[in-house]
From Swiss-Prot:
Keywords: Repeat, WD repeat. The gene is DCAF8L2. PROSITE patterns: WD_REPEATS_2, WD_REPEATS_REGION. Residues 44-54 have a biased composition (Polar residues). One of its GO terms (cellular component) is cytoplasm. This is DDB1- and CUL4-associated factor 8-like protein 2. Residues 77-88, 108-147 have a biased composition (Acidic residues). WD repeats lie at residues 226-265, 269-310, 316-356, 364-404, 420-459, 467-507, 511-550.
Length: 631
């Protein structure tokens, strides 16, 4: 959700479900109990049940019967399991030749009972021994499996066991610290409702949309399914009435997301995966900008967001172009970045729209870019991130290539300045007022920087628990004042952190395929759209009756942390193997091209330089494929 409070033209009214029964506000508050009737009446006004024409949600709105169907299906499956077990028992008796119905003679009854008791005791003892042995074997196997991937002292005996125990204890302590009790919410439901009734809360809805109570009640409302491949991008128009999506099928779909139907479906004109498609602001939804893996930047001309005219290429990168950055109020200008390290500014009013702003370099070496964002408070400034650890801020008015490669200032976590393994930044985004800058690092955490701090300043906050490894994963602020941080994860979950406390307050299963890449908040409503490896767009709204329980959170973040640590340990060996292969290949090529007449074993200087530059490019490409493969 951006900071803008756009027009509500064409949008449905909000009304019917309760959104404010958070456990934090129910902590023994007697006053809240006495005023429960008032709260029920007020909260009914603040629900987020969205329908196309104000009708019942069952007539094309949000589905509300899923939980009942799930419960009934679970009961049916449970009854089927019970019947299956009874049939198996019956077959067991038939195969063993025993009789289900045995009637002893009168004189034999007591004797048989004693014999049966003895047999049962013997069989019971044997079964208990067998079960104990099986349990011990299973425990030993589990311990072996857990110990195998761990890196540590390889000695036998107590040293290895002590190391494993210390490692497990440290991991448990880390998980506990990340899932500790949440602080008291700043926005109080009872107080806010009371002030609203008195007329002293004119921005009630605006403030409520940034409240923790809404975020903790998010649940999946429906899926928008019309793509035949991964969906890489979703974007709301300025008024929030339309949603654009695109992906691997090269199609762009414009949705009426409230009525759950596409209003426009057209070919993008790209030849490879579309990475981003965005409506330009203040143009009546008539212009859509796109970029893709083929390096092209294209613009589609729409008429009232319901009729497609054509697309044209306005810029060409020499590598994949992952992100666009819009100027908040301009219907003509935007920025693009690509893996060729180039930043273009596009002005649709010019005959030649694209002009090169800067080529990102570090120590005279190009740095491929994955992300770009414009400062909403100062549109001359923009930030980029890519194939190294630095977030760079530029000012278009004073880019001097001779001074610090034109960089105004750059940030990175201090522990990553001289790290032993390559680090990538997959997404950078400014807060609603441009004072903060959020950066998501590949195989690391999410860091918050103060954009007004001096060059090289340390991060101010750090958000942990998710995993960012396999794709170019996005991150975003959520809330009218950027109160929350939201990100997808390789584990298929969506994580919400409260920015002030850096703690996880919401944890949602967002993908069947395992990765969520793009998260787009609505401009002013408490609605979130997301996409990833699944072939659909998911719409989330805060319509759950109670706050979502963070069931399984500790297990998931523990697994994410363990997998990340394992990858960091193995990365060095993989890189060394690649370098060994490259050196052997280089030596072989030199042997083949030796001058047999003179016996010289050295290349000319020009060929050596060219080979060196080629090796740098190859090394970068391999590292990119290993660490940060775009979807």
């Amino acid at each position: 959700m951006s900071h803008q409070e756009g027009s509500t033209d064409g949008l449905p009214d909000l009304g019917t479900e309760s959104l404010f029964s958070s456990p934090e506000e129910q902590s023994g508050a007697v006053a809240a109990t006495e005023a429960s009737s008032d709260i029920d009446i007020a909260t009914s006004e603040l629900s987020v049940t969205v329908t196309g024409d104000g009708s019942d949600s069952r007539d094309g709105g949000f589905p509300n019967d899923a939980s009942t169907e799930n419960r009934s299906s679970d009961q049916e499956s449970a009854s089927e399991d019970i019947e299956l077990e009874s049939l198996e028992d019956f077959e067991h008796f038939l195969m063993s030749g025993e009789s289900l119905f045995h009637y002893p003679l009168v004189g034999e009854e007591e004797t048989e009972r004693e014999e049966e008791d003895e047999e049962i005791q013997e069989e019971g003892g044997e079964e208990e021994e067998e079960e104990e042995e099986e349990e011990e074997e299973e425990e030993e196997e589990e311990e072996e499996e857990e110990e195998q991937p761990r890196a540590g002292p390889q000695g036998s005996g107590g040293n290895h066991e002590q190391y494993s125990l210390e490692e497990d204890q440290a991991l448990e302590e880390w998980v506990s610290s990340e899932t500790s009790a949440l602080p008291r919410p700043r926005w109080q439901v009872v107080t806010a409702l009371h002030q609203r009734q008195l007329g002293s809360r004119p921005r009630f809805v605006y403030e409520a949309c940034g409240a923790r109570a809404f975020v903790q009640r998010f649940r999946l409302q429906y899926r928008l399914a019309d793509h035949v491949g991964c969906v890489n991008t979703v974007h709301f128009n300025q008024r929030g009435t339309r949603l654009a999506s695109s992906g691997d099928d090269l199609k762009v779909i414009v949705w009426d997301w409230v009525r759950q139907r596409p209003v426009l479906n057209f070919e993008s004109g790209h030849t490879n995966n579309v990475f981003q498609a965005k409506f330009l602001p203040n143009c009546g939804d008539s212009t859509l900008a796109m970029c893709a893996r083929d390096g092209q930047v294209r613009v589609a001309e729409l008429i009232n967001a319901s009729y497609f005219n054509n697309t044209k290429c306005v810029a060409q990168h020499r590598g994949p172009a992952h992100k666009l950055a819009l100027e908040p109020d301009s219907p003509y200008k935007f920025l693009t970045s690509g893996e060729d390290a180039v930043v273009f500014t596009i002005d649709l009013r010019q005959d030649r729209p694209a002009s090169k702003v800067v080529v990102t370099r570090e120590n005279d070496k190009k740095v491929g870019l994955y992300t770009i964002t414009v400062n909403p408070a100062n549109t001359y400034q923009f930030a980029v991130g890519g194939q190294d650890q630095f977030v760079r801020i530029y000012d278009q008015r004073k880019i001097d290539k001779k001074e610090n490669n034109g960089v105004l200032k750059k940030f990175t976590p201090h522990h990553l300045v001289n790290c032993d393994f390559p680090t990538n930044i997959t997404c950078v985004v400014y807060s609603h007022d441009g004072t903060e800058l959020l950066a998501s690092y590949n195989d690391d955490d999410i860091y918050l920087f103060n954009s007004s701090h001096s060059d090289g300043a340390q991060y101010s906050k750090r958000f942990k628990g998710h995993r960012n490894n396999t794709t170019v994963k996005g991150v975003n602020f959520y809330g009218p004042r950027s109160e929350f941080v939201v990100s997808g994860s390789d584990c298929g979950h969506i994580f919400f952190w409260e920015k002030s406390s850096c703690q996880i307050i919401q944890f949602l299963k967002g993908s069947r395929e395992g990765t969520i890449n793009c998260l787009e908040p609505h401009p002013y409503l408490p609605v979130l759209a997301c996409s990833g490896l699944d072939h659909d767009v998911k719409i989330w709204t805060p319509t759950a009756k109670a706050a979502t329980e963070l069931t399984g959170l500790k297990k998931v973040i523990k697994k994410n942390k363990w997998e990340r640590d394992e990858d960091s340990l193995h990365h060095g060996s993989l890189f060394d193997q690649y370098m060994l292969w490259f050196l052997l290949r280089h030596v072989t090529q030199r042997g083949r091209h030796q001058d047999w007449r003179s016996g010289e074993a050295e290349f000319p200087d020009e060929e050596s330089d060219e080979s060196s530059s080629t090796s740098e490019t190859s090394e970068e490409e391999v590292q990119d494929r290993v660490q940060c493969m775009p979807s």
